[in-house]
């Protein structure tokens, strides 16, 4: 009996290890899928907005004309407000999952509080945070100060791929705003405010009605 031992703990440990590996594998697959989706969007936008340097001048002109006819419009993923378009496209940054634009729409607000970039190879860059003026979603940042080797990024707007969606202007296959999202956030806020005011008025009227009914009931008993 002294020489006997149980294999159950070992089996349990092995099972836990297998479960842990399956969980890690699932998380890895999800992460790779998300990275692949972001990479695909970057490639799509880049291909729609810039020409390959190896193409002829005529081809580049034709592509530029086509892009001008059907440019991409970038939208906020939360409230679908237009943020900019591919006519101001400069470049894409796959390492940070961002697109660089020369200008943006009035729906993009800038937080004037400046901070240093924490991104790799961007030492010395001073940034200002960008956010959607409609829903306050963080969109990215704008480069305000850069070292000499990154001067080309200065005053460019860097929008995060995760915060931006796009559609092709003039495309009949895509709908800018669905019926469920017809009212923007400002309209919803105003409607909710009006409903709250109506509820308050009804509450006051109900209280007065009860008061009148109470007085009538007492008057009926005394008559």
Swiss-Prot record:
Residues of the Mis18 domain: 71-169
BP terms from Gene Ontology: cell division; CENP-A containing chromatin assembly; chromosome segregation; heterochromatin formation; pericentric heterochromatin organization; protein localization to chromosome, centromeric region
Post-translational modification Phosphoserine, affected residues: 33, 36-37, 223
Keywords for this protein: Cell cycle, Cell division, Centromere, Chromosome, Isopeptide bond, Metal-binding, Mitosis, Nucleus, Phosphoprotein, Ubl conjugation, Zinc
Function per UniProt: Required for recruitment of CENPA to centromeres and normal chromosome segregation during mitosis.
Biased segments, Basic and acidic residues type: 21-30
Biased composition (Polar residues): 9-18
Protein name as it appears in the record: Protein Mis18-alpha
Binding positions for Zn(2+) per the UniProt entry: 76, 79, 132, 135
Self-association and partners: Homodimer, and heterodimer with OIP5/MIS18B. Identified in a complex containing MIS18A, OIP5/MIS18B, MIS18BP1, RBBP7 and RBBP4.
Family to which the UniProt record says this protein belongs: Belongs to the mis18 family.
Keyword Metal-binding (UniProt): yes
Origin organism lineage: Eukaryota, Metazoa, Chordata, Craniata, Vertebrata
A single GO cellular-component term on record: chromatin
Compartments, as annotated in UniProt: Nucleus; Chromosome; Chromosome, Centromere
Listed InterPro entries: Mis18, Yippee/Mis18/Cereblon
């Amino acid at each position: 009996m002294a020489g006997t031992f149980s294999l159950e703990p070992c089996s349990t440990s092995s099972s836990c290890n297998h479960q842990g590996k399956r969980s890690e594998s699932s998380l890895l697959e999800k992460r790779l899928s998300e990275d692949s989706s972001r990479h695909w969007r970057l490639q799509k936008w880049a291909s729609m907005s810039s020409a390959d340097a190896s193409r002829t001048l005529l081809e580049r002109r034709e592509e530029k004309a086509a892009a001008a006819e059907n440019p991409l419009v970038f939208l906020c993923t939360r409230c679908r407000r237009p943020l900019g378009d591919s006519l101001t496209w400069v470049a894409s940054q796959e390492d940070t999952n961002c697109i660089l634009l020369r200008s943006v729409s009035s729906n993009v607000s800038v937080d004037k509080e400046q901070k240093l970039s924490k991104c790799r190879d961007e030492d010395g860059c001073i940034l200002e945070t960008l956010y959607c003026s409609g829903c306050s979603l963080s969109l990215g940042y704008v480069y305000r100060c850069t070292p000499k080797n990154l001067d080309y990024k200065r005053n460019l707007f860097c929008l995060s791929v995760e915060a931006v969606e796009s559609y092709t202007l003039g495309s009949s296959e895509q709908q800018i705003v669905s019926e469920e999202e017809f009212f923007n956030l400002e309209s919803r806020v105003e409607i909710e405010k009006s409903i709250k005011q109506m509820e308050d008025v009804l509450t006051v009227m109900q209280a007065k009605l009860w008061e009148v009914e109470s007085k009538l009931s007492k008057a009926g008993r005394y008559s």
